[in-house]
């Protein structure tokens, strides 16, 4: 049976920003209730933050998701180039929020430098241990901020470009986080899973809410988006999406490395999703769980 196992146990879902949340079966009865819990902070900020600050995250995720960093960079670098085209910077302050091992920060910085941009790097994370990992891979970081991205000490428009890679789905207050990003940053690059789709919602109905509960408990996703709702939230926060792409993650799933861990049913489903994504990426994201990568300009 691929129901219940599909996607959730796939290696790509060992995100750099995974976090553990505790919620009862009754509370996770259905998707709409989970959304309500998230919006009302039913999953407490303190509970969420403790997973990072206690060091539990690193103990459970020792690789910090470095295995899929190269794939992520193929989707993120085009957004970095869009930032350069739109802003023509001579120098740039670069913030990585929830950046795991810091490899994406390192490569984005290198890309900017190759384009003639002088870069000043910052890292922000709830975990001091995670920040130390960032420092190991980015010894030239100017400052490491042990803070919550929804409430920072950064000055107004103090950052030119912020990286939010697999982070927004974890925050307890999406609107507050986007508002804070508007305050502190001129541009933001997001990578976000689109988990409010036909496939996930159908499985959740069949499993009586257990799929959404598993998403919370296994990978810490307390927010589920589709692109339309996400775009509306970004626009409401004062952001303008300059460029976006659906990632067609199914192409990655079908790579030789990932296929070693698949059963036949998974390969078949990914092939179907990959075909649909090739024809209509937007439609595919409504049917199956893909990611969107976008760059947002804030004024």
What are these regions (language model features)?
Residues 141, 159, 184-185:
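Short, well-ordered alpha-helix to beta-strand connector turns
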């Amino acid at each position: 049976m691929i129901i219940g196992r599909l996607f959730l146990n796939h290696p790509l879902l060992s995100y750099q920003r995974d976090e553990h949340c505790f919620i009862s079966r009754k509370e996770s009865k259905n998707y709409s209730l989970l959304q309500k819990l998230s919006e009302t902070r039913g999953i407490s900020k303190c509970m969420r933050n403790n997973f990072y600050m206690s060091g539990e995250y690193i103990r459970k995720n020792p690789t910090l998701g470095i295995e899929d960093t190269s794939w992520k960079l193929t989707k993120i670098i085009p957004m970095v180039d869009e930032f350069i085209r739109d802003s023509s910077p001579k120098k740039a302050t670069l913030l990585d929020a929830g950046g795991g091992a810091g490899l994406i920060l390192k490569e984005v910085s290198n890309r900017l430098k190759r384009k003639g941009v002088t870069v000043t790097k910052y890292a922000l994370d709830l975990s001091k241990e995670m920040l130390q990992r960032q420092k190991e891979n980015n010894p030239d970081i100017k400052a490491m901020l042990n803070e919550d991205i929804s409430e920072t000490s950064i000055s107004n428009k103090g950052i030119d470009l912020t990286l939010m890679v697999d982070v927004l789905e974890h925050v307890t207050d999406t609107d507050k986080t986007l508002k804070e990003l508007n305050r502190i940053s001129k541009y933001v690059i997001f990578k976000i899973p689109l988990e409010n789709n036909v496939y996930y919602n159908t499985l959740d109905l069949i499993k009586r809410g257990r799929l959404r509960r598993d998403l919370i408990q296994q990978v810490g996703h307390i927010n589920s988006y589709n692109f339309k709702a996400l775009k509306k939230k970004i626009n409401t926060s004062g952001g303008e999406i300059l460029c976006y792409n659906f990632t067609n993650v199914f192409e990655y799933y079908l790579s030789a490395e990932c296929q070693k861990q698949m059963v036949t049913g998974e390969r078949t489903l990914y092939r179907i999703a990959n075909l649909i994504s090739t024809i209509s990426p937007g439609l595919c994201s409504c049917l199956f769980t893909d990611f969107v990568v976008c760059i947002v300009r804030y004024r």
